Design a protein with these regions (language model features):
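Short Gly/Thr/Asp-enriched flexible loops that form oxyanion-binding sites at enzyme active sites
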Residues: 86-101, 168, 172
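Loop/turn-to-beta-strand initiation segments
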Residues: 1-2, 73-77, 153-154
Length: 285
């Protein structure tokens, strides 16, 4: 059997009795970083010396078959550096391979940065989506945010402290300066901090430099029905500035939730015929 064990995200006191028992009984531990696993065993006073296997993003696919075969013979405890394996951490391919091989998979629930950030954010938690890390490159990041512009659910992201300020600036630019945001830093640790405000306010705050492990929680978009006429004007304005019609239609559709096809067809119909366009740019002979 494969056992997914949720480990503390900062406070060792959050290690559950079940996790401690599993660590003490484990003959095989699969860890994202074996050094972190050894540190956890020592910190919790576990004296057993299990076989340790490293499984990370770069070797999980190759290791999965070997670990599944081991799990046929003995319980295999799988750990990430912090939190639950498979959640923005290695483990998905292993669980998939185990399911395909009819090997049982169970989990020891526990600490989660995603759920903890949601709980303390002050934003709606009845429906949410976890988006992992925002893209590193600014253009890719803004594109990802545009795709989420009309997402009605609360959104949770992980972010590097080095990119926090620029990401918050992009959030303010793409999702709106007044969009409600919470930045959760060093959750469960000594210097835990939750900063709440608008995207613009938090972008200014982060510009001074922020350290630690970061979760960003963003309020979902309010349900506002887009006006097709206004959206069409936006498409035509983009086209007039040099954007291709197809690209302009796609961009406005992402931002408004309207149909790309309908916007494209409406813009085609609204543009003057080619002959009249040519007449404006070519003088009469």
């Amino acid at each position: 059997m494969i056992i997914l064990g949720a480990t503390p995200i900062g406070n060792l006191g959050d290690a559950s009795p079940r996790l401690r028992e599993a660590l003490a009984a484990a003959e095989v531990i699969v860890a994202e970083d074996t050094r972190t696993a050894i540190h956890l065993l020592r910190a919790l006073g576990v004296e057993s010396r299990p076989r340790l296997i490293a499984m990370h993003d770069h070797n999980e696919r190759e290791r999965a078959a070997e670990i599944v075969e081991l799990a046929r013979e003995t319980d295999v405890l799988v750990l990430s550096d912090a939190g639950m394996p498979t959640v923005s951490d290695p483990g998905f391919h292993l669980v998939d391979a185990a399911a395909a091989a009819d090997v049982q998979v169970t989990a020891i629930p526990g600490p989660s940065a995603v759920v903890t950030a949601l709980a303390v954010s002050g934003l709606a938690t009845d429906r949410f989506t976890f988006e992992g890390f925002l893209p590193r490159k600014p253009g890719d990041r803004r594109s990802s945010l545009r795709a989420l512009a009309t997402e009605p659910r609360t959104m949770v992201f992980f972010e590097s402290p080095n990119r926090l300020a620029s990401s918050l600036e992009d959030i303010a630019s793409v999702l709106g300066a007044d969009r409600r945001v919470a930045v959760c830093r060093e959750l469960t640790k000594l210097f835990e901090e939750v900063k709440r405000g608008t995207a613009a306010e938090l972008a200014e705050w982060a510009s001074g430099g922020v350290k630690g492990e970061i979760c960003i929680v963003i309020a979902g978009a309010e349900a506002v029905e887009a006006d097709p006429a206004t959206a069409l004007e936006q498409v035509l304005a983009l086209v007039a500035s040099g954007t291709r019609l197809k690209d302009a239609s796609n961009e406005v559709a992402e931002a408004t939730g309207l149909s790309k096809r309908d916007l494209y067809q409406a813009a085609l119909a609204a543009r003057p015929p080619k002959a009249s366009q040519d007449a404006r740019v070519r003088p009469a002979p």
